[in-house]
Amino acid sequence: CDIGGASMELAEISNGEVGKRITSSLGPLSISGIAGGKRGQKLFISKILDDLHVQMGSQSDRLFLVGGSWRAIARIDMHRRGYPLHVMHEYRMTFKDIHKTDEYIKNYGLDRIKSEIRISSERIDLVPIAIQILKGLIRRFKPHDIAISSYGIREGTLYEQMPQIMRDRDPLIESCHFAERKDARLPGFGMRLHKFILPIFNNIIPERARLVRAACLLHDVSWRAHPDFRAETCFDYATRSNLGGLSHNERIFLGLALLHRYRNKRNARQLEPMISLLSSDDKKEAE
């Protein structure tokens, strides 16, 4: 679901293919000009969403949200929850989260929220309308979860220009190869290290195998940092840098694995809120 100022688009995605697509006038800027105040806006939103539901049919998979208004809602949700990993891409929400954030906005007010969160005035003023659209969308389509995408039309246009062989590459591994070439002391050694340790990880699932490979490629990219802070720098590199193809848990898992490349025991209290998002088994495996 891609929302702009004057429109909102829905597209069905399955097995890498785009299916049904539809556009609507459900943009926050368009709705703000509807006559009849909040009641008129609510009726307009409800009618358009009902039409969209009929045309798109039942959908119960993941809902991907694209667009600045959705990201603003997600940023406020992060703030409300005290969520420690401030990475927008792949941030997950539930319908309960959306409802709580709507109440949070009503109780605290936009001025107070704006003073505490870095969101432009133009963007945050549209949030109350955008969140009503989102709540109505979720009530009708009932997705099993909601994911924020920090990508948009620009990235989609770039992807369209890529040959298939490039599209098929793993974005995480490609990012790590680039980081190694740019920052490591011995570019290329990461793959040798991976080959050397691979027998230890013979039976791990593919999702973990790619994290092992990524950790090998990134094992030395923070060598320039002061030795006293090198472990934390490794963790920050994985959790805050522009790596694609990673869930939030996978970011933290990778960061923790890299942290322990330099330190047996972690004693950085500021990292614990993020690390606590992992299960005990995941922490142990990363270490």
Where do the model's predicted regions map?
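Glycine-rich, histidine-containing beta strand-loop boundary motifs that form or position
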Residues: 2-3, 150
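Short glycine/serine/threonine-rich phosphate/pyrophosphate-binding segments
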Residues: 3-9
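Helical "lid/coupling" subdomains associated with nucleotide-phosphate turnover
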Residues: 12-287
